[in-house]
Amino acid sequence: MELKELIAKAKEKEVKAMEELFIRFTPLLKSRAKRYSGYGLEYDDIFQQAALLFIIAVYDYEERPSTSFAGYIKKRIDWGLWVYYRKYLKQKIEISYGLKIGN
């Protein structure tokens, strides 16, 4: 099935289409999880977070001539995992030093 068609069907909550998209993009999710696991995060936790970000990104995706689906997914996952990592660091600092940072 063509990528455009898979995206449209996945957005209509068709499980098989979402599964196929997920399978196609699993190498990206794994590479991003591996990158962040090098910063002290658990690989499985990061991969699950990346999977959740992927599903949300599929639902949010709007086709535009200037943005490919793969590029959009990569940016959304990178940004989402960066935010997740920052929250992890904040929590680690608070626990280590007994501090309350921010709100």
Enumerate the predicted regions with their spans:
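Charged, low-cysteine interdomain linkers and short loop/connector segments
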Residues: 85-103
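Alpha-helical promoter-recognition and RNA polymerase-docking modules of transcription initiation factors
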Residues: 1-91
